[in-house]
Amino acid sequence: MTFKAMLMLGATAVGALSVASGAQAADGKEVQMLHWWTSGGEAAALSVVKQALAKQGYSWKDVPVAGGGGGAAMTTLKAMVAAGNPPTASQILGYYALDYADAGKLADITPLAKTGDWAKVIPTALQKFTTVDGKWGAVPVNIHSVNWIWINKATMEKIGGAEPKNFDEFVALLDKAKKAGVVPLALGGQPWQEATMFDSIVASTGGVDFYKKAFIDLDESALKSGTMKKSFDNLAKLRDYVDPNYTGRDWNLATAMVIKGDALAQVMGDWAKGEFAAAHKEAGKDFLCYRFPGTDGSVLYNTDMFAFFQVSGDRQAAQTALAETTMSPEVQIGFNIIKGSAPARMDISDASFDTCGKKAIADIKAANAKGTFLGSLAQNYAQPPAVATAYYDVVTKFVHGQIKSSDEAVTQLVAAINSAK
């Protein structure tokens, strides 16, 4: 059954109807936002948008759905749209936005895009997801990249560590932490977190061209190659440096382990930096940010977008206000400083950003210019959700020992992706 067909069936489940009933706007001055930004840093960043809208006379109604990967939120959104009560807008990732556009459920905000010259300031790679057939139905709030390592500086100094320049040096650094009695690697044992880390491992092991061939092009020779096997071998090496209590841990709790010095490092997208900021920690003083060893010069990106749905006429002014406010330079700066991300607009100065933020902005511009700005498979920017889900399934089974060897993991990855395509 197609995505469009599922929506056209309507919301038949009782739970779907109960969720959808909460989406009816009280009046035309209310912005209803479905999102999964429930951690401290995320909530603080979202408040920048809320406050900017409040100055324009708009109230805000959160429809929060916890879960860092957004899977639960997308299930809720599907129910709301199917029931005929979509929110003003929803946080959304990649191919999910295209699904709603193809189903004819998104509003057309192209006039706003033309007035604001958004096509000139937003990377072309992102516009693939904000537009369909030249019509804008979503706006990017930020640009995140997943190929980062976050390190507690005091712990790093305590163990005598240095920035790892390649994968072997990273393993050696983790080994130092282990011998010092510190948890080397903070990880949450959830499929999306494990897959996010594996994105970086694949790009490091095979290089950015291999990552593109395997995950963007879905080239079967790359997927079944010795390089992919080695990538799983390297994932197994990192798994050995994770504490035994990681299963089911939320990503922000793993970040908190690094913030508190209970763990040395975390491999995570730069939304983790928002948690450091919320804890009043400073880049370079309290924590360090490095590109995952072997991925310098490339950016594996995702972008949080706000997708706008077809709503009644009295709710459209709120949509316009939200879209214009989100794309304003002031909000792009204020939001992303707190969130830990880079602005989605390429014309924003980095003057107000910390050292990690400046590096993120510079890296994105450089990668965008030389063709190494590539979508994260784990974050739904390399392939549609069905393929990403198949990827999650194989990676998490390998991490948790249900798949016993790298050879078996490669075989299952090829089969799962071929089945999902």
What are these regions (language model features)?
Residues 23-98, 103, 115, 408, ...:
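Conserved N-terminal structural module of periplasmic/extracytoplasmic solute-binding proteins
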Residues 51, 159, 240, 278-342:
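Extracytoplasmic/periplasmic substrate-recognition and gating elements
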Residues 79, 86-88, 118-151, 183-184, ...:
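A structural signal for short loop-to-beta-strand junctions that line the ligand-binding cleft
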Residues 94-146, 171, 197-199, 357:
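Hinge/lid segment of periplasmic solute-binding proteins
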Residues 110-124, 162, 189, 205-230, ...:
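Short, solvent-exposed loop/beta-turn-alpha elements that line the ligand-binding surface or hinge
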Residues 136-141, 171-220, 263:
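Extracytoplasmic/periplasmic solute-binding protein
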Residues 140, 347, 362-417:
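C-terminal capping/gating helix-and-loop segments adjacent to ligand/active sites or protein-protein/ligand interfaces
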Residues 174-176, 216-247:
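Glycine-centered hinge/linker elements that transmit conformational signals in sensory
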